[in-house]
Amino acid sequence: IKRIICGLIIGLVLGLVVPQASVISILGTMFVGALKGIAPLLVFFLVMSALCHMKSGQKTNLKFIIILYMVGNLVSAFVAVIACRLFPVTLTFTDTASATDITPPSGIAEVLTNLLNNLVKNPVDSIVNANYIGILFWAVIFGIALKHANKGTKDALENISDATATAVQWIINCAPFGIMGLIFSTISEQGLDALLSYGKLILVLVGSMAVVIFIINPVIVFIFTKQNPFPLVFTCLKESFITAFFTRSSAANIPVNMELCKKLGLDEDTYSISIPLGATINMAGAAITISVMALSTAHTLDIHVDFLTSIILCVLAALSAAGASGVAGGSLLLIPMACSLFGVPNDVAMQAVGVGFIIGVIQDSCETGLNSSSDVLYTAIADIRE
């Protein structure tokens, strides 16, 4: 963690002092690229290996973890709604050039349909395009099919899985250099001025996420484990949140989370599935972003949103957030769908997406950090509860 902080500080200083030295940003691009490149293989082989070695009748806690993921999404959306009622935000709409080529989903049905279509896509195509729902589906199919394979086949699969995990560890050891490149790129390209005009919106978004991280999640930990929640919460923040914050991709953080689960001594048969699944459907941060941006757009247009509509928004945000899987800025694409609940025209909703891109350097970083660190937290809760 000390090396990562050093990399962060050096990247910040270099971004302010020599912003033209663009070669430094290559370190960040390579780090994120390496994590994204290895993650699909890690998930595929780890899940296959875990399932083919699983004995009949062996228990996992996946059902409970999935329930935690969904509850986390719903509660986070509710926190965002309360925050927007206490601190209503008026948006300053700008040019949406960065969002003009985006086609947002037409509704929750399209989001869920896309999710189901991704489930059965070609397994090779899924690995190449980091389609984690598809990777999980085929890894489970092959893993179950290989349960009756001979010992040599199972050992070979386990060796490949171990080799992939070792490669991941080597990449993670380069995190200080990667984070230095990422923070340099952010500061040199975005600067700090672009963020100041949206200060209140950023505070509401980040504040809502902080409430979930420091209040809601510890309460959930305590309810199910009857232990002091903060050691586990802060371990997840230190080991998972920080790297997710800078990579801004739940998919890229999967190897980091796998390594943390191993360090915590969690059941590999469970976390090898729950972590990549969490990167797809555990989107508490996305639920907050969707809710806050939709309600802020409604407030800007003087549209009154009653309590019942707010509750419907919570459910809609929680469900649709599960479709914003593993993609930096993915939740922004779902803002127009949430805005349609209030009758906001699509062109205006797309302006809200444009605002999201401007503040994305903070919003998306915090959102991904919350999403990804919660994957480990909820998996650990299920393990400790047993």
Model-derived regions: residue spans:
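Active-site-adjacent helical/loop segments in soluble small-molecule enzymes
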Residues: G37-S49
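Signature of multi-pass transmembrane helix bundles
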Residues: I1-V17, T29-L35, T60-P231
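Helix-loop-helix junctions within the multi-pass membrane cores of secondary transporters/permeases
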Residues: E239-A321, D375, T379, E386
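Hydrophobic transmembrane alpha-helical segments of multi-pass transport and channel proteins
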Residues: A34, I38, M70-F78, V206-V211, ...
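Juxtamembrane helix-boundary/capping and inter-helix hinge elements in multi-pass membrane proteins
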Residues: C52-T60, H148-G152, Q190, K226-P229, ...
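Membrane-interface alpha-helices at helix entry/exit sites of multi-pass transporters
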Residues: K59-I65, Q169-N173, K263-A279, F307-L308, ...
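Transmembrane alpha-helical segments and their short flanking loops
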Residues: T92, V292-E386
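Membrane-water interface of transmembrane alpha-helices in multipass transporters/channels
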Residues: V23, L27, K59, K63, ...
